[in-house]
Amino acid sequence: MVKPLALDETTLEAPEWRISDLPVPYEEAVKTMEARAAAIAEGTAPELVWLLEHPALYTAGTSADETDLLDPKRFPVFSTGRGGQYTYHGPGQRVAYVMLDLKRRKPDVRAYVQDLERWLIATLAEFNVTGETRPDRVGVWVKRPEKGLTAEDKIAAIGVRIRKWVTFHGVSLNVEPDLDHFSGIVPCGISQFGVTSLADLGHTATMADVDLALKKTFRDVFGRG
C-alpha cells in the first residue's frame, strides 16, 4: 500500500468533494480555485477536491513552447499559472482540481506530485489498467505493445500550482474524450508518444464510475478523504 503523506489526523478535516455535472468554463474554474486556495491558506475553508469537465480548450503552462501549439484556432487557448506545457481539456476527460494544505500535510512539492501520480495509478487499477510513471516524463503512461515494443501512450496529465503551500490545479484523466482533439498541440511537449483513454483501451467506464474510483483511492494515498 502507498504510504500516505504525513499529517495530523486529529486536526485535519477531510477534504470537501465537489462534482460539477455541467462543463465549467476554464476562467471560472481558475477564479474559483484561486479563491478557495486563499481561503484554505487563511484557515477559513476546508480542503477541496473538485471533479469536473471543461468545454474543449487548450491550456499553456509556465513551460509552454509556442511551437507546440500546432493549431491555435481550433479551440480557445488559455495561459495558466500551473506548471507544465500545453495540454487539452474537454468533454470525456475527468479533471480533478486538488486544493490541499501541504503545510499541514507535508511541505514537499516533489512528494506531492508523486502522490498525484500514485493516486491516478491506483484509480486506473480499479479498471484493470496498469498505469506507470517515467522519471523523465510527468504524468501516467500505459504500454501499447500492439503498436510496437517500446510504444507508450499518456492517459493522465498533471499540472500543479502551489501558493502559500496550498495546492491548486491538479490532474486530468482521459475517460472517453475525442483523442483527435489532442492533435492541435504537442501534448506536454512530448511528440514521440501518443495519448489514450479508458475507452481507447477497451474499458467502458462512466464518469460516475471514475469519480467513485478517485474517491476510493484518495485516502490510501493522501491519508484523508
Swiss-Prot record:
PROSITE patterns: BPL_LPL_CATALYTIC (PS51733), LIPB (PS01313)
GO BP terms in the entry: protein modification process
Pathway(s) this gene product operates in, as recorded in its UniProt entry: Protein modification; protein lipoylation via endogenous pathway; protein N(6)-(lipoyl)lysine from octanoyl-[acyl-carrier-protein]: step 1/2
MF terms in GO: lipoyl(octanoyl) transferase activity
Class of this enzyme: transferase
Residues the entry annotates as binding substrate: R82, G83, G84, Q85, Y86, T87, Y88, H89, A157, I158, G159, G170, V171, S172
Catalyses which reaction(s): octanoyl-[ACP] + L-lysyl-[protein] = N(6)-octanoyl-L-lysyl-[protein] + holo-[ACP] + H(+)
Catalytic residue list: C188
Feature type site, description Lowers pKa of active site Cys: K154
Listed Pfam families: LplA-B_cat
Record-listed E.C. numbers: 2.3.1.181
Main location: cytoplasm
Extra remark: In the reaction, the free carboxyl group of octanoic acid is attached via an amide linkage to the epsilon-amino group of a specific lysine residue of lipoyl domains of lipoate-dependent enzymes.
Full protein name: Octanoyltransferase
Organism annotation: Parvibaculum lavamentivorans (strain DS-1 / DSM 13023 / NCIMB 13966)
Lineage of producing organism: Bacteria, Pseudomonadati, Pseudomonadota, Alphaproteobacteria, Hyphomicrobiales
